[in-house]
Amino acid sequence: MTPFDPAPGLIAPDFEQLSLHLPARCLFAFLSEARIERFAREKGGTPLGRFASITKSFPIYELQTPDGPIALMQAPVGAPAAVLMEERLYAYGAEKILAIGCCGALTDLPENAFLPVMKAFREEGTSFHYQEAGDWILFDEAPRLRIEAWMKEKGIPCSHAVTWTSDGFFRETKEKIKARRRAGCNVVDMEAAALAACARFRGKEFAQILFTADTLSSLSHDQRGWGYHGRNAALEIGLAAARVM
């Protein structure tokens, strides 16, 4: 592995020089485009613009709340793609991002449990471009505590996620799962460590809520309902939680 280099990159996240000014807070959702579009329409959201990539274009909406405007955008799956869009959100005005999406359970967690992330085990590659090498990245405590307090106030069951961020969806082996559980991980995802590392590098505030979908707790795979009910609730919970960031 090459040493971490904190020098500026030669390509800036705002290289396109878009006429786009985002609200300070953003909800970054690992959910389908159709679900996000429907939610934005139901909330009276306003289209702000789009971020283009080689494979697709990502619409950005502005939702009005009693605590001010919040941007809403679909997050692409996988650490490199997710951070590519996170960087652009920061470049065009976002100061605080709340990511929300599903995860796999490694321990005996029920399906559709919503878990604010406390820390992530770094077994992807993207975070190492943004922080010195190390096994873990701790998430910002202040926004997590505000989100947890809000969840408790609303009666939403709340416990921490200690997540294993992996690039290898089909390489979650029995021995790796055992090792990650011994280290304290209770869920697995594909982006959290990288998103937190990017936010810290850019000096921005970041939090993430994961909801449980499938499970590997028995050292075999049970897809359960793939977090279907969690997906239905995620945008409402995410928007409300973003208001307290």
Where are these regions (language model features)?
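Generic non-transmembrane alpha-helical segments
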Residues: R146-K154, C198, I237-M245
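Flexible, glycine/charged-enriched surface loops at secondary-structure junctions
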Residues: P47-A52, I156-A161, M245
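Short acidic/polar active-site loop segments enriched in Thr and Asp
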Residues: E95-K96, N186, E205
